[in-house]
């Protein structure tokens, strides 16, 4: 999967780090989570493969123990998922870690975001290493719930980098987010339906919003085109226009 993500143009691959017993209580959910829980040795194997493929390894920390494990493994970029936006102990540890931190903001309102960001700032978060991620925690997320314009608000109010965590069925929002100045776009990735048969699809909510390698690569290519299309903001005659200059109308 890591090699395929590299082929598809991803700059990094992100996993999920959690301890099931600290994260969930209903036993039916816990059984599902244990199927995907990664041990410390699993993390080391994945990190080695990422190094081999020359792609950045990062992970989402769902609890304090997992966050400290990632720090001990010298993971430099750690995401705090939306469900932990209210975990002030974890946010404080993240702010004090010196790591690059992505903070996702699904299932929150404006006051929640302000409280969390200001708490991290108060505990020494280097805002040059901080990315505030717009996210709508719906699988799939309907277009009217994406709310890309909040990215402008985030960057203006908090003076930080912004990113977009995409759960939409179409890659349109991910591509459009470039126009709002994102430095990070996160999108779920799968190899295909092969291997999902051991799970109940009802238990894998991200499958409908995940892209396999070739569609993912198309999305990345279009994102790169969108980045080039933004331009400088200064109006000038581009060299691409020069062959047409002699055709300009002249009126007296």
Question: What kind of feature is each model-predicted range?
Answer:
Residues 1-252:
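Catalytic cores and adjacent flexible loops of soluble metabolic enzymes
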